[in-house]
Amino acid sequence: YVLLLGTDGRPGEDTYRADSIILARIDPTQKQATLISVPRDTKVEYKGETMKINACHTVGGAEAMVEAVNELCGVQISHYAEVSFDGMQALIDSVGGIDINATDDVDDPEHLDIKITAGQQHMDGATALTYARCRYTYADGDYTRMRHQRQVLGALANQILNNFDATKIFGLVNSLSDMLVT
């Protein structure tokens, strides 16, 4: 299993939460990945305290998140990757953007400044990040956001595996080197 973490850290901050928590099971023989989102507000026991699972990151970083998700899901996570908001945006931009069928409109001027219309479109990093972050305008809030996050990851994987221009490989590697922790 691989734990994928999207963090809400901003420059100058020492501690931050995991804004996106996705457990991935990779099956290389079937060439298939299964993604399961863990709601960020899930209550867990960590180091004797009850807290939201996303707060484990503020206590012990990605290692604490691995421990908490292992315990919650009863699995053994062997690797993790962590990316910040800025890092995700740069990664998507480094591969030329992603093609995605947006299942919902995004219009949340109080929290995000990009509007998105539902339907098939090409998204740059800023637009894809907005699509993956929006939750306040949906009745089911975080559940729609988690679905959007999985869509963005799927579109990113598709772009890298099927549509990526190999001449941009150095830009991709450079963007990854600053943001991934394994």
Where do the PLM segments sit?
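Non-catalytic, solvent-exposed segments at the cell envelope interface
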Residues: 1-182
